[in-house]
Every structure is written in C-alpha cells, then in structure tokens.
C-alpha cells in the first residue's frame, strides 16, 4: 500500500519505531529515512540477520535488536516479543504493558493458544486491546490466472471465512 500521506506528518515526537518483520508493507525505507536520527528503531532478535541487514541497507541506520520472550523497556512501556512458530515465517507478536493497560499486537502472525497463555501471564490477565489481522496480506486468489471469476470469488470467501474463524478462536482463547 502507498504510505505517501505519512510524509505529511511531523513524527519528531516519536519515542521509538518498532518493525515486526521484513515485508515491505511493514518496512517503508522512505518513511524510516525521514525520521530524526535520535528515534530508535527496534526489531526482534531473529536467528537470521535479514531484517537488521535490510534496515541498515535501506536506511543507513542500525536497528536495536530485542531478545525474544524477555521483558524490555521502551520509554515508560514494558514490552515482550514472541515469534510466529511457523518455520517458514519470520514474524513477531509484540505485547506492551504499563501499570494500567496492556496491548497484544499479533501483527501478521498466527498466535498459538500456549503463546496467548504466556502473553496473558506476562500482562497479568486479558489485554485491554487486541490488535489482530482479519484480512489476508496477499493478493491470492485474485492475481491467479488459472481461476475463473466464480472460482476466485469462492476461494476468496473461503479465505475470509478462515481468517475470521481464526480471529474468533483467538478471542475465545483470551476469555
């Protein structure tokens, strides 16, 4: 998606920028390069340095890597990072908490029940806010030429239903 309208804002009051994974819809080099140098960029400490290296190459800035499943402090906010358990995805889930509020941001990750329990232990109960993706981040099935329009619509509906069922299962796991 285009992010050109972000450039119209003054972002100098940010305390930090967090990048969950290396997909370009989460890593906009033009936007990151426009930020003041004193705003740190935080990323998960993945086994691979791909994300770190990509940020350095695209922005000439060094991101700060945060270890996984350990508590970190960014300003006045505590955070902890989990990663998607799928071996093919390098994506992260960020959990933030203060003394009063908590947020679980699953970003593009699929989170397991055991991870949710661990996150709830970290924040001390149910989150005040759950951010979860309810739409697919790819163009399947619409860019696939082997499907006719009826098949594309059917596959698309199945995909949406699967996403919403997953979202509902996460919400039920929190209760």
List the predicted regions and their residue ranges.
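Active-site neighborhood of phospho(di)ester-bond hydrolases with catalytic His/Asp-centered motifs
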Residues: 13-25, 42-46, 104-109, 129-135, ...
């Amino acid at each position: 998606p285009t992010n050109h309208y972000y450039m119209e804002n003054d972002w100098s009051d940010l305390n930090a920028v967090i990048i969950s994974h290396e997909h370009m819809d989460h890593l906009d080099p033009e936007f990151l390069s426009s930020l003041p140098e004193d705003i740190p960029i935080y990323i998960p400490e993945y086994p691979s340095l791909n994300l770190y290296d990509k940020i350095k190459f695209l922005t000439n800035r060094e991101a700060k890597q945060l270890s996984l499943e350990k508590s970190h402090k960014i300003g006045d906010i505590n955070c902890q990072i989990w990663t998607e358990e799928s071996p093919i995805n390098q994506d992260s889930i960020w959990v933030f908490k203060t003394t009063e509020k908590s947020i679980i941001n699953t970003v593009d990750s699929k989170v397991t029940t055991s991870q949710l329990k661990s996150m709830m232990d970290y924040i001390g109960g149910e989150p005040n806010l759950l951010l979860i993706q309810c739409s697919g981040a790819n163009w399947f099935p619409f860019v696939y030429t082997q499907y006719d329009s009826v098949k594309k619509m059917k596959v698309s509906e199945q995909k949406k239903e699967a996403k919403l069922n997953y979202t509902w299962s996460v919400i039920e796991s929190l209760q």
